[in-house]
């Protein structure tokens, strides 16, 4: 006698198949959506990484978008030279040429009345003369003793180009701009058939209370550390070494119960600045116990160990570390490719598809 299914049984089987199919599709959809949280102390390069994602995965900045950054380029340039001139007074550094004192006074007058997004030839001339001065250069060489944008020399060395009336910022100029991130900046892009949602969170202490809203369902955290911060203090607390602050923050993120199953990717950033700085500023400023040489390889490896040793779940949790230069598009492209492969593997495991 044949075994036939009743209409009710057939419907139940179909329902079961549909549920299985939906679960499978949901699993695949979850595997394809990646929520990336960019964390790290202030000025560690998080926003630059976000800009690189736009350049690498979204055809970069249009000419109109680049034009909008002209205001920021000029503001960063003017604020940088002003910061150096002010520091000269504090550090008791004299101008190489007495005539530059008049230029300094003129700088404050012209900067105060400058139209937004305009660099007059008079203002550009004053800044150029000041930047060439021996005393100003001596003060710039001591920039670890005060707060100065990383991009200061990049813009000041290129004043002839950026002060042209028809100047339009390049992609690299845009990458170098510094605007403090307040709140949460969200970026979406697709790469390797994954849909990325990247969240850039302000790194200053006052911004950190906003992070909590981003924690749910995070696939991976990219934690940015500025290697070159080892001899600097915080903008918001001049008693606190920036590297120590980063370590404290990484400890709290890496060992947080929220992130037990979250991939942690460590970007040891600004490797280019670190490579230059380590030749003249010893690592013992930050790590008095350090006995190695002040070479890039040895000092960078030591910092890497300091961070990775903070991981209290080494047996179950791996830290994926990369040395980066956030302003170098090729480097970021290469690193992000490797990061994505790790995310794909871990994400598929989570969904039971690997």
From Swiss-Prot:
Lipidation residue positions, type N-myristoyl glycine: 2
Cellular component GO terms, alphabetical: centrosome; cytoplasm; heterotrimeric G-protein complex; midbody; plasma membrane
Domain of life: Eukaryota
CDD domains, per database record: G-alpha (cd00066)
Ranges where the record places region G3 motif: 196-205
GO MF annotations, alphabetized: G protein-coupled receptor binding; G-protein beta/gamma-subunit complex binding; GDP binding; GTP binding; GTPase activity
Region (G5 motif) location: 324-329
Region (G2 motif), start-end ranges: 173-181
Residues at which Mg(2+) binds: 47, 181
Keywords attached to this entry: Cell cycle, Cell division, Cell membrane, Cytoplasm, Cytoskeleton, GTP-binding, Lipoprotein, Magnesium, Membrane, Metal-binding, Myristate, Nucleotide-binding, Palmitate, Transducer
Topology in membrane: Lipid-anchor
Family assignment from sequence similarity: Belongs to the G-alpha family. G(i/o/t/z) subfamily.
Complex formation: Heterotrimeric G proteins are composed of 3 units; alpha, beta and gamma. The alpha subunit contains the guanine nucleotide binding site. GTP binding causes dissociation of the heterotrimer, liberating the individual subunits so that they can interact with downstream effector proteins. Forms a complex with CCDC88A/GIV and EGFR which leads to enhanced EGFR signaling and triggering of cell migration; ligand stimulation is required for recruitment of GNAI3 to the complex. Interacts (inactive GDP-bound form) with CCDC88A/GIV (via GBA motif); the interaction leads to activation of GNAI3.
Name of this chain's protein: Guanine nucleotide-binding protein G(i) subunit alpha-3
Gene designation per UniProt: GNAI3
